[in-house]
């Protein structure tokens, strides 16, 4: 099946991004050299559903060099980079993704990916797993198992497992030390504020920042906001994490109270409807609402 992307002519820019990543990922390169020499995944089909940008694209290319037939699609319509998708197609991978896909297009891309009947899946957010357990059980015939990248997807997996419905083994990559201690805390913590500041052109110093959720992503976001000079307020439903936030030097209160005083609100819970209409009614005019969770459902629009 042919790839479905926005424009193959964008590939040059995508190659440049992936090449830059290549030079800055020595650990993956070392693993990739071994996998390539052994042809570890020869004859295997791997479906990769991730935030499709240069770093994840390079992972897909490493798997491709290790002999796999790699099928790539995005795990969020708002994060796919069209030039990176084009570069992967030029390098011989199959891609079904473009930026700004509608819900219908997004799930069509996922279904086209699963039409390849994977041996292994790499999921980010749990949508591949959800389809395999609902409408696409036919695509499980070769499936050995897979990995899940993020908190949202791991929560969905735990739900299936608790109900006794999980039909194949999944590795919770999000629960590894290197993921949550470094990527979640430091990576998300920094990139969240980079995105907010570039988008709004606001300084953070002196602002009252409300961080919803004090998991590892929330910890990183709060830490970086404090470093930028903000007064940080944390909202958290888990009493242990709430106490941890207090011990880390942050003020803790319910969202109903925080809504009245915050200037910038950032949700990082992996849950839905964290900020709702009753909260927005009590907010000051001109506040900034931002979501750094996987899906765009934490702020009820």
Predicted feature locations:
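Glycine/serine-rich phosphate-binding loop and adjoining beta1-alpha1 elements at the start
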Residues: 1-41, 72-80, 85-207
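Short glycine-rich or small-residue beta-strand-to-loop segments that form or flank ligand, phosphate
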Residues: 44-49, 71-73, 210
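Glycine-rich phosphate/diphosphate-binding loop of Rossmann-like nucleotide-binding domains
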Residues: 50-67, 183, 187-261, 267-272
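A short helix->loop->beta-strand "cap" motif at the edges of active sites that frequently abuts
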Residues: 67-69, 93, 139-142, 229-230, ...
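Short internal beta-strands
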Residues: 68-80, 233-236, 292
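Rossmann-like NAD(P)-binding element
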Residues: 115-126, 250-298
């Amino acid at each position: 099946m042919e790839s479905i992307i926005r424009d193959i002519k964008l590939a040059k820019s995508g190659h440049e991004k992936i090449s830059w990543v290549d030079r800055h990922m020595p650990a993956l390169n070392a693993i990739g050299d071994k996998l390539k020499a052994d042809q570890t995944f020869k004859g295997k089909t791997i479906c990769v559903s991730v935030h499709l940008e240069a770093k994840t694209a390079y992972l897909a290319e490493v798997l491709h060099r290790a002999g796999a037939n790699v099928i790539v699609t995005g795990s969020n319509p708002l994060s796919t980079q069209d030039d990176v998708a084009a570069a992967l197609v030029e390098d011989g991978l199959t891609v079904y993704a473009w930026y700004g896909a509608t819900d219908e297009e997004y799930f069509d891309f996922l279904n086209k990916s699963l039409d390849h009947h994977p041996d292994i899946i790499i999921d980010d957010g749990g949508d591949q797993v959800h389809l395999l357990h609902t409408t696409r059980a036919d695509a499980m015939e070769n499936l050995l198992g897979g990995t899940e990248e993020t908190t949202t997807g791991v929560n969905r997996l735990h739900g299936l497992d608790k109900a006794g419905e999980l039909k194949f083994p999944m590795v919770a990559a999000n629960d590894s030390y290197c993921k949550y201690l470094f990527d979640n805390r430091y990576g998300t913590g920094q990139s969240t504020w980079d995105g907010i500041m570039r988008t709004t052109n606001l300084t953070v110093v002196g602002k009252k920042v409300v961080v919803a959720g004090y998991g590892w992503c929330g910890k990183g976001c709060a830490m970086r906001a404090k470093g930028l000079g903000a007064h940080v307020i944390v909202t958290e439903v888990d009493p242990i994490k709430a106490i941890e936030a207090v011990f880390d030097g942050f003020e803790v209160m319910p969202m109903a109270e925080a809504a009245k005083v915050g200037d910038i609100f950032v949700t990082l819970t992996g849950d839905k409807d964290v900020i709702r209409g009753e909260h927005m009614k009590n907010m000051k005019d001109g506040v900034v609402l931002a979501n750094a969770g996987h899906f765009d459902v934490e702020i009820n629009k």
